[in-house]
Amino acid sequence: MIALYPGSFDPLTYGHLDIIERAARLFDRVVVAVLRNPAKVPLFTVEERLSQIQKAVRHLDNVEVEAFHGLTVTVARRLDARVLLRGLRAVSDFEAELQMAQTNRTLATEIETLFLSTSTEHSFLSSSLVKNIAAAGGPVSHMVPEHIEKELRTRFAGAPL
């Protein structure tokens, strides 16, 4: 069975990676789909995020990474994915995620949404938090893989504090 894990991943955190690694044990194939959203200005380009994630998951043979735009269910259908994966950090995530799952269900009744709770040690993480801390010169090595930490440091080098 194929599972699709969509998101912006700007940047990928250890929380995201935890979900990907656990999903890789549950499914035959996991596709990490990086959102290309022209309405948002990301810190990293789609190409940079694809590269970051590919490097982080290279130890997982059944995980692929690709970019997408448009409806998630359209991508899922194209890939023949029957499951959309979503990570939940806290109860506060649930309401928005449930609404999205119900919306996706109305668009594609054959596709299920599976919620995986983030491991406790990563439950506080978000890409926004990582960017804010990195922008202020704070440590993020416990939040993101080393290669992403280096890219964050480079991106924010010389940024005003």
Curated annotation (Swiss-Prot):
Binding site for ATP: 8-9, 16, 87-89, 97, 122-128
An example Gene Ontology biological process: coenzyme A biosynthetic process
Keywords from the named record: ATP-binding, Coenzyme A biosynthesis, Cytoplasm, Magnesium, Nucleotide-binding, Nucleotidyltransferase, Transferase
Main location per the UniProt record: cytoplasm
SUPFAM superfamilies (UniProt xref): Nucleotidylyl transferase
The keyword Transport belongs to this UniProt entry's keyword annotation: no
Single annotated GO MF: pantetheine-phosphate adenylyltransferase activity
InterPro entries: Cyt_trans-like, PPAT, Rossmann-like_a/b/a_fold
Residues annotated as binding substrate: 8, 40, 72, 86
Subunit structure: Homohexamer.
Name used for this protein in its record: Phosphopantetheine adenylyltransferase
The encoding gene: coaD
